[in-house]
Amino acid sequence: MGGGTPQENNGTDLLFFTNTHTHKVDELAHDPHVNLSFVNAVGEWASVAGSAAVVTDRELVKRHYTPTLRAWLGDLEDGTHDGSENDPRLGMIRVRMETATCSLSGKGVFGTVKDVVAGAVSGRVACVAKLREISRAEVDLWRTTEMA
């Protein structure tokens, strides 16, 4: 569902809105292991491994609710299932990060192209990105560190 990606615990827990009356809720109850992948326009990416749980806490839903979520639920015109923050179908999936891998360049498109061309001319392998593994211990430390 849309609505952005709210975060908790210094960004180590990601929240996604969901319709709790769907099969994915049953699937997560059976096997909570998930992997999320993200990529940006310059090809940098992140892969997050973790566990997911469905959360129906109304206060949490209300805190992150945006009216655009109605487009994903619809109004059943029964006075209850209206796509609002009070719609009982609306819940959240909390993904608790366990480990992550990311590939970051920090160079942008032109910097990457420059490195590829230089590699092609010199015969050296182009270094277009740095691969970073984030361990469970690092995630746990990140989760509990006070951020300014």
Model-predicted regions and their roles:
Residues 23-97:
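Short, structured beta-strand-loop surface elements
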Residues 83-148:
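C-terminal edge-of-domain segments
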Residues 1, 48-51, 112-115:
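Short amphipathic beta-strand/extended segments with alternating polar/hydrophobic composition
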Residues 18:
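Ligand/cofactor pocket segment of small-molecule handling proteins
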Residues 12-13, 34, 61, 138:
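A general marker of short, structured functional hotspots
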Residues 1-14:
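N-terminal structural module
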Residues 7-10, 54, 99-101:
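A generic structural motif
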